[in-house]
Amino acid sequence: MKKLLFLFVMVYAIKLHIKGKVQGVNYRYSAMQQAISLQLCGWVKNNADGTVSAHVEGPKEIVELFIAWCKQGPPEAQVLHVEIENTEPKNFTDFTILR
């Protein structure tokens, strides 16, 4: 009798709302590069009020690394606050910049 091995990875999903000097400083592009390097899925976008939002999915420990990066951002950014909200996974297959 053959034994089957199943590997289950819990997908953790969050929404982020980043406040501060986060537009016009390559925040979205840098966030996308960071997410891709961590093999996370989701999106990032600018908002009309000058903030940046993101939806990120992946293993909890890796998502937490991304959150830590978001609190710093790229060198030109000045992040004042990051709001974090748990949400349901949407099963994205890549990470993109929404316009």
Describe each region flagged by the PLM.
Residues 2-99:
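Intrinsically disordered, low-complexity, mixed-charge
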